[in-house]
Amino acid sequence: MQVENLHTSVACNRCTECADWGPNGWIAYGACNAIAIMDPKFQGNSAKVLFTLVEHTKRVNTVRWLDCDKLLSGGDDAIAILWELDETGTTKSFTLKGHTSGVNTVDGIRQQDGSWLLATAAADTTIKLWTFQDNNYVCFQTISLSDGFCFCLRLQLLPKSNQVLLAFSGDDETVSLWSEQVETAGEGDSLGRQFQRKHKLTGHEDWVRGLDFVVDGEDLLLASGSQDNFIRLWRIAPRSKEQMQENRVDLHQLSHNDDEIKVEEKILQLGKEAWYAVSLESVLYGHEGWIYGVHWHKTPDQELRLLSASIDKTVIIWAPTEEGIWLEEVRVGEVGGNSVGFYGGKFSGDGHSIMAHSYQGGFHIWSQDPDRPQLWTPGVIVGGHYGEVRDLAWEHSGAYLMTASADQTTRLHAPWLQDGANPTWHELARPQIHGYDMQALALLSRYKFASGAEEKIVRTFQAPANFIENFRHISGIENDDAGDVLLDSLPKGASVPSLGLSNKAVYKVDSEVESTSKTSKDEYPDNYFVPIALETPPQEETLMQNTLWPELQKLYGHGYEIFALAATADGSLLASTCKASNAEHAQIILWNPSNWKQIQKLSGHQLTVTQLSFSPDSRYLLSVSRDRRWCLYERQDSSVSYQLVASTDKSNGVHTRIIWSCDWSHDGQFFVTSSRDGKVVVWKKEEDCKESSLNGWQANGVLELKNESITAVAFSNSYLSGTDDTYILALGTETGLIKIYQFVRGAWKLLSDLNKSQAHHLTVRRLQFRPGKQLQLASCGEDHLVRIYDIKLT
């Protein structure tokens, strides 16, 4: 069996040094405890996460490309990892251990002898310097910052020299410059290399969050971006011994508390006969918020460009005039929407594209127009959830996948069909942006769904006309009778009013109100909707505010937070459950989506019902619970009401711990349950079964995985190719693994075992096979990842 990763969706971690654009054209970024490697030019004009690197055990805080095949990362698990990777994703990794707290910034540089000098800074108030050569690493120095904290650091080789300069910023609003000295014993024997402090650059009035070096002829330029909204450019220029003697300033007599801007040159001795002058080149002001990232780029003509990213939702490219005055050349960013701003930005290797990642983990990419260099246009990018993904559901024909997350959003993922290219998957809409963490969802039809969050209400939504038009165009949807019926009657879109949680429908007439009737408040609404005809998948800015679905109805009836939802295949029934500690609240409520009225309440469980599943023909409703039992309800003839017909108890229940998941086979002959006790049980109705509470249902096959908790299970939508009695099941575990099994006549056979790099590195929350002829599996987990796999049987 071959399993190919068709789609991976995940957001960038909320850290300032957490994304980098490498010289190989790939973007690496921290994604929960993993590192995602994305190709932003996949198939020319698309984007795709190629693979993930999993070794960190806590959140990844920082990533830094050192070369085309070397990547350095640091995480909250107090380690840094040096990765060596090739185009296929095959990696070797070397773990740098020594810190006692989370590593928050890293850098590295290749030296003239071919070895690597690496620097790591952590929350344990230390900076560690390492050498790496021939697959061996050594920590040769630890710089203690006393009670200080390092936000950013950079290493740089001085031009025409093997001398290394270390710059780092701390919580004292300064930038420290250190250089290496070779210490010798009294008789001239070398004791080894050590870095010593040479100077502190003062002037900023708040923490410095971004640093970057660039070589300018024989000089170095250092850019520092600060939370005081200013960028300072520092020039480090070589000086002869004669110049040094004329201009020398005794640095040791400078007060460390002198906050005054010092424009005069400061002479540094970096080596025995190497003298450098440090001076303030320029101060740039253009941002209205904290500056979190700066990045240099040198054009083929040796012209310098500086990129700055700020929490004020803008990214600026700065360029010097002929007179040497630095001016703003390009400004891009977000407008409107529920966003905070940018946590970092980078140039591509050729400088014709720029990337920024936001507080909510979304990526933005802009590319320079070849014909009009001053025009930068937004491009297609991959994003995802920035919180644990708790539920997913396929549209009934497999046209799209919808996911719900603790980041308070539901997102719709669909393929982008282009002529002459394989489809690539992208986020096409964000139907719900809520004020509560999302928990569950169920699709009622192609353009209607219900969702539950950490509130007592079930909310239902219907797609607006603008989404239907764009969805058809991007995904190549034809023969869409459901959409044809809705197009003329539906609102164009939706928006969320100030201080509201409900998506309010926006009709065409809303935008045609005479301007004379508008108050100043109405002219600039907090969240607005403008119909857009999309040719490509939408950018993050559009997704945040222009792809909401109008809310149809709120369903009241539960006493606690919604926990699980399920709908029949035809969307004629909706079932919901909530968190419960007694039988009254553990009841399942059935709703009629045609009039949104309660049909009945189903009793049977004592504690929270964790998952629900209707049989393909809607005859049965299966529920599993925290009370370690499953209940089966059967639909009464010519009625919409259900009745409890089978359940397990202490004497006949196979499971001994909470039952997390359940599913039906496509033919309705079997259902499966999985539990924290590591057991997966397939149940079938047998005529000769004597157990009264089971009413003929009995365990047909039990799979037990020792020391595993099975948190998700799913049947495929067809038999194994060429058979009429062989089923395929997928299991997800608490450790993040996905296992695919063949099940035939009570026997299990493992077909494929996906490791943490291929699957998830935290708990798998939901699995579901895509409806249709293809064998494709969707998964989501607590690691923020949503994945779609294409499975080929060999």
Swiss-Prot record:
Gene3D superfamilies: YVTN repeat-like/Quinoprotein amine dehydrogenase. It is found in: Cytoplasm; Nucleus; Cytoplasm, Cytoskeleton, Spindle. Disruption phenotype: RNAi-mediated knockdown is lethal in larval third instar (L3) stage. RNAi-mediated knockdown in sensory organ precursor cells abolishes central spindle asymmetry during asymmetric cell division. WD repeats lie at residues 55-93, 98-140, 147-188, 203-244, 286-328, 337-376, 384-423, 433-472, 557-601, 604-643, 654-693, 705-751, 759-794. SUPFAM superfamilies: WD40 repeat-like. One of its GO terms (cellular component) is nucleus. Coiled coil: none annotated. Pathway: tRNA modification; 5-methoxycarbonylmethyl-2-thiouridine-tRNA biosynthesis. SMART domains: WD40 (SM00320). Keywords: Cytoplasm, Cytoskeleton, Microtubule, Nucleus, Repeat, tRNA processing, WD repeat. InterPro entries: Elp2 (IPR037289), WD40/YVTN_repeat-like_dom_sf (IPR015943), WD40_repeat_CS (IPR019775), WD40_repeat_dom_sf (IPR036322), WD40_rpt (IPR001680). GO terms for biological process: establishment of mitotic spindle asymmetry; tRNA wobble uridine modification. It holds the Pfam family WD40. Folds into a two seven-bladed beta-propeller structure which is required for elongator complex assembly. Belongs to the WD repeat ELP2 family. Component of the elongator complex composed of Elp1, Elp2, Elp3, Elp4, Elp5 and Elp6. The elongator complex associates with and stabilizes microtubules; efficient interaction requires the full complex. Component of the elongator complex, which is required for multiple tRNA modifications, including mcm5U (5-methoxycarbonylmethyl uridine), mcm5s2U (5-methoxycarbonylmethyl-2-thiouridine), and ncm5U (5-carbamoylmethyl uridine). The elongator complex catalyzes the formation of carboxymethyluridine in the wobble base at position 34 in tRNAs. Binding by the elongator complex stabilizes microtubules and promotes their growth. This is Elongator complex protein 2. It comes from Drosophila melanogaster. The lineage of its organism: Eukaryota, Metazoa, Ecdysozoa, Arthropoda, Hexapoda.
